[in-house]
């Protein structure tokens, strides 16, 4: 009832609502709760790109959404306010408007001098005060609010250095505005922002902090002053996301990866962990990917587990992992009757001949082991998640459909693709964003071609979207005699012009300190940042096979400039290639997605199967 307007943020007691108008914060009472509905302006310094709005670049005159968050006391709010005024513009053009129009947005490149400045703002709606917290420590630092204690006395947050290799866990007293540094962590070469995890318990008296200080992600129990009380988990496996916490029982339920032998290390397995001492109890016994949902009491949970080759089971279990009741059984008989077949799992070695890589293989429905099929690798480099499916699904990014044309289709992991296999595995690609996954993909295909006589290792294709598009183009230009055809969609081919946070974290950025003297001889320190990455444009000249480049011309994530630069490099090298620009499309292709898929199918059929019928395609309905 109360949240019918998305731009309003209601207080927990529903007495107040806060919103943004013309970049400033406003509050008023909820008339349905008997409160005064007079609008009160809380701030006056909000401007475009230094706003209190969710979208700091908005030019809306009316009410808009804010990222501000209420505290439990329904009095205080907090917000990370972003100052983007010095950022440079980026553009896309919508050619489908009546008069083609320019869309301008702020965008940071790796190594930029002027980047977003983050402020932590505390608002008191009763006292009508807005205060900026003094949290400055590092230039261009990132701020990540975590939680507020139940008594609304303290807000916990993380601040991270621009180079991503240092982080502080801090608290701020909402009454005095005093900031306290609790835990300082140095993590070289970087602390993965997608794998971090902190739990604040008992109003800050207990802190569960995840760290990779041993080379493996594990949890450590600190007191409220930052003193380490005990290690909770350890060993050569990864403790991951927390599923539930029983504060009275002093127990944590969390996912773990790679602890159990002969089980894919990417599978989510559930474990029971004690807060006050080290040790884990496995709760997942079935070989599969587990997703759990605990009941409020933490006495029971629902466990849905499956594999790509095993249908889901949905079980009610107790908190000791014992099955009580199967709740439901999916019915996919229609899929089987239509000829659908489960994909198959496989394991190969990485190019180091040591590391196991897990993959999935799709075959045609009419597969004949006496025939020989070209192979297509569907790729994504990571490094913040692995792209190989682990759960049962009928929707697999067109892999099943592609296989029906007469291909063996695979998705295989590679070193550096996921944080769930330990720090050494995950950081494999640091400083080498373009090349790190390529050798493993090539070597995996070579092993499969030797293992299975039905795979033609001389007819190899590769396809990917976004980072996968970047990887597909890099692969065919790095190993031009191996990959014969590649479809590269919306690829970030030149990471010098891609997302700053992505490039500086996963490829690395070097902080350069310089001492500057003013006219009076006073010295101050200035910081600059150097970013070095290898773009695909440097290797475009190596292309021998067939390459299709695809982009949406309204893509504000991976700007079409990436694809245009790659195309220009190919033109300058005198290379023949295919290119599809989808008008009006962003990073996804929307209503044109099926059109793109058909283009891709015909491209691979022509260049890997020798099927040229698509060259003579026509619309049989055109004369109706």
Residue ranges and their predicted role:
Residues 36-39, 128-132, 178-180, 227-231, ...:
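Predominantly a core beta-strand signature of beta-propeller blades
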Residues 30-33, 124-128, 174-177, 223-227, ...:
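Short loop/turn segments that connect beta-strands within beta-propeller blades
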Residues 22-28, 87-92, 117-119, 164-170, ...:
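Structural motif
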Residues 147, 152, 289-624:
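Serine-hydrolase catalytic core recognition
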Residues 34-69, 78-132, 322-333, 387-398:
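Predominantly five- to eight-bladed beta-propeller fold
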Residues 2-18, 27, 48-76, 104-112, ...:
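Conserved beta-propeller blade repeats
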């Amino acid at each position: 009832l109360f949240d019918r307007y998305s731009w309003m943020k209601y207080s927990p007691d529903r007495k107040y609502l806060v919103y943004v108008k013309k970049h400033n914060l406003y509050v008023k009472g909820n008339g349905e709760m008997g409160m005064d509905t007079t609008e009160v302006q809380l701030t006056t310094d909000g401007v475009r790109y230094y706003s209190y709005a969710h979208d700091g670049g908005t030019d809306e005159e009316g009410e808009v959404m804010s990222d501000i968050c209420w505290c439990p006391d329904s009095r205080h709010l907090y917000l990370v306010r972003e100052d983007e005024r010095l950022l440079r513009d980026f553009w896309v053009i919508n050619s489908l408007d009546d008069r083609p129009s320019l869309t301008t947005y702020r965008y940071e490149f790796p190594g930029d001098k002027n980047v977003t400045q983050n402020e932590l703002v505390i608002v008191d709606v009763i006292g009508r005060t807005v205060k900026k917290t003094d949290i400055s420590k590092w230039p261009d630092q990132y701020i990540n609010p975590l939680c507020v204690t139940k008594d609304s006395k303290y807000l916990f947050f993380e601040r991270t250095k621009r180079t991503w290799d240092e982080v502080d866990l801090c608290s701020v007293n909402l009454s005095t505005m005093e900031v306290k540094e609790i835990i300082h962590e140095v993590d070289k070469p970087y602390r993965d922002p997608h794998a971090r995890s902190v739990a604040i318990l008992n109003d800050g008296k207990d802190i569960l902090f995840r760290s990779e200080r041993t080379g493996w992600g594990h949890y450590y129990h600190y007191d409220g002053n930052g003193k380490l009380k005990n290690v909770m988990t350890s060993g050569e496996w990864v403790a991951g996301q927390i599923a539930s916490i029983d504060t009275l029982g002093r127990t944590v339920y969390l996912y773990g990866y790679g602890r159990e032998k002969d089980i894919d290390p990417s599978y989510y397995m559930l474990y029971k962990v004690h807060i006050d001492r080290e040790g884990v109890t496995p709760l997942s016994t079935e070989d599969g990917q587990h997703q759990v949902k605990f009941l409020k009491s933490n006495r029971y949970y629902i466990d849905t587990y499956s594999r790509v080759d095993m249908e889901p089971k949905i079980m009610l279990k107790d908190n000791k992992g014992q099955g009580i009741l199967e709740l439901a059984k999916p019915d996919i008989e229609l899929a089987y009757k239509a000829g659908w077949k489960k994909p198959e799992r496989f394991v190969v070695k990485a190019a180091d001949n040591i590391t196991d890589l897990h993959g999935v293989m799709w075959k045609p429905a009419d597969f004949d082991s006496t025939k020989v099929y070209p192979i297509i690798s569907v790729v994504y480099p990571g490094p913040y998640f692995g792209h190989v499916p682990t759960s049962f699904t009928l929707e697999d990014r067109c892999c099943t459909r592609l296989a029906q044309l007469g291909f063996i289709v695979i998705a295989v992991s590679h070193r550096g693709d996921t944080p769930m296999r330990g720090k050494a595995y995950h950081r494999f690609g640091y400083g080498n964003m373009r090349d790190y996954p390529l050798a493993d993909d090539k070597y995996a295909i070579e092993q499969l071609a030797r293992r299975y006589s039905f795979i033609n290792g001389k007819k190899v294709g590769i396809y990917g979207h976004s980072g996968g598009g970047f990887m597909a183009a890099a692969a065919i230009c790095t190993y031009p005699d191996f990959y014969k055809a590649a479809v590269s969609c919306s690829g970030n081919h030149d990471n010098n012009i891609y997302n700053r946070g992505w490039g500086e974290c996963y490829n690395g950025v070097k902080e350069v300190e310089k001492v500057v003297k003013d006219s009076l001889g006073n010295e101050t320190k200035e910081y600059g940042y150097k970013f070095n990455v290898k773009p695909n444009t440097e290797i475009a000249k190596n292309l021998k096979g067939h390459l299709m480049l695809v982009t949406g011309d309204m893509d504000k994530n991976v700007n079409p400039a990436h694809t245009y630069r790659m195309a220009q490099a190919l033109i300058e090298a005198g290379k023949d290639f295919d290119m599809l620009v989808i008008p009006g499309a962003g990073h996804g292709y929307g209503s044109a997605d099926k059109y793109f898929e058909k283009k891709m199918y015909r491209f691979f059929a022509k260049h890997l199967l020798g099927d040229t019928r698509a060259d003579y395609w026509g619309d049989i309905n055109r004369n109706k």
